[in-house]
């Protein structure tokens, strides 16, 4: 999960109450470990813009040293977090819920201890968390078939998304490894953009596992497991989209801090809130649209402006506290987006061997 706080995911959803306990990692009947929630007693997160907006005043200040370069997936640190676990903003729905914060903290700790190449432990989601998942599926079921792009709808059938259970990250990997070779890896919370984007270069998408607070199933102030699974994961199984998102990651390998900030905004306007042409219509492929009933309906209404993506131009600010998006950036196809971004990566000095569909995983 990139260190960007999502706006409200406006979903008309069912509520629910829950009793929280502590979590324990234990062996289940399956071959994968699972996480169980068992009993025990029980500073606002800072926005990414505040942390990584470049402050450099000279060219030498703005460059990234060789020691900072990320050269393999093993250099990508999923512990590079700007905010996670129980570190919730005061206006977060779970801020005054100690048990919820404790559960978030435990899930964060579990994510931080995960090692590349090892199975991801299952999380045993509570009945209230499952009810939240169910509510989101119910709301989106009427809009996604009409307004999601064809690649998303095709890939969605590959995953066991249904009411009654929250899918596990390791299940996602079983599908992704057999289709595009991608891997989902757990992360504790809001990940630093340099490390998050670099993970994409090596075909690794970092995902949270925590659920939004049950008191407001229609809203999450940051990406949660609902957003990650419904919004991001399905399209990672599409080769053309997978190449597009990997190209953003590849560009980051050659980027200095100022360019990382620019790429973060490119990511926002494509991977989070991008749309693609299908005939005389535009369809959603951005995860922030696909996982939000309200944003999806807003996109479909035609109320927002449509603009062509140009990664060479300064990108508008990322709107995450102003309600729905005022504009969406349009691609003619994922292949077109990959070509644009590959050209941008070349302008940063990325070696030709790492451009396009080159595998660096």
From Swiss-Prot:
Pfam families: Biopterin_H. It is found in: Plastid, Chloroplast. Residues 56-67 have a biased composition (Low complexity). One of its GO terms (biological process) is L-phenylalanine catabolic process. Its cofactor is Fe(2+). Its main location: plastid. InterPro entries: ArAA_hydroxylase, ArAA_hydroxylase_Fe/CU_BS, ArAA_hydroxylase_sf, Aro-AA_hydroxylase_C_sf, Aromatic-AA_hydroxylase_C. It catalyses: (6R)-L-erythro-5,6,7,8-tetrahydrobiopterin + L-phenylalanine + O2 = (4aS,6R)-4a-hydroxy-L-erythro-5,6,7,8-tetrahydrobiopterin + L-tyrosine. GO terms for cellular component: chloroplast. This is Phenylalanine 4-monooxygenase, chloroplastic. It comes from Chlamydomonas reinhardtii (Chlamydomonas smithii). The lineage of its organism: Eukaryota, Viridiplantae, Chlorophyta, core chlorophytes, Chlorophyceae.
């Amino acid at each position: 999960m990139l260190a960007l706080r999502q706006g409200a995911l406006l979903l008309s959803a069912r509520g629910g109450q829950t009793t929280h306990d502590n979590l324990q990692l234990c062996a289940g009947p399956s071959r994968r470990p699972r996480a169980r929630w068992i009993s025990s007693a029980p500073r606002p997160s800072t926005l990414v813009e505040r942390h990584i907006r470049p402050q450099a005043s000279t060219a030498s200040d703005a460059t990234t040293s060789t020691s900072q370069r990320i050269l393999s997936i093993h250099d990508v640190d999923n512990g590079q977090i700007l905010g996670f676990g129980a570190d919730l903003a005061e206006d977060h729905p779970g801020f005054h819920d100690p048990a919820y914060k404790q559960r978030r903290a435990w899930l964060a700790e579990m994510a931080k201890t995960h090692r590349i190449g090892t199975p991801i432990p299952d999380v045993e989601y509570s009945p209230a968390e499952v009810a939240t998942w169910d509510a989101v599926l119910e709301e989106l079921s009427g809009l996604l078939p009409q307004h999601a792009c064809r690649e998303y709808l095709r890939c969605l059938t590959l995953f066991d998304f249904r009411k009654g259970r929250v899918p596990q990250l390791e299940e996602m990997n079983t599908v992704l490894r057999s289709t595009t070779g991608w891997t989902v890896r757990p992360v504790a919370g809001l990940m630093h953009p340099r490390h998050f984007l670099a993970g994409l270069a090596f075909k690794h998408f970092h995902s949270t596992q925590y659920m939004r607070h049950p008191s407001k199933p229609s809203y999450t102030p940051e990406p949660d497991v609902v957003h990650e699974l419904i919004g991001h994961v399905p399209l990672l199984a599409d080769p053309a989209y997978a190449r597009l998102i990997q190209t953003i990651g590849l560009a980051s390998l050659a980027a200095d801090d100022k360019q990382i900030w620019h790429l973060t905004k490119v990511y926002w306007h494509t991977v989070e809130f991008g749309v693609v042409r299908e005939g005389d219509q535009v369809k959603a492929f951005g995860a922030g649209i696909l996982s939000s009933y309200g944003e999806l309906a807003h996109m479909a209404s035609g109320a927002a402006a449509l603009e062509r993506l140009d990664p060479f131009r300064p990108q508008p600010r990322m709107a995450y506290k102003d309600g729905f998006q005022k504009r969406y950036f349009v691609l003619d196809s994922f292949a077109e987006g990959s070509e644009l971004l590959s050209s941008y990566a070349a302008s940063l000095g990325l070696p030709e061997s790492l451009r396009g569909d080159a595998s660096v995983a």
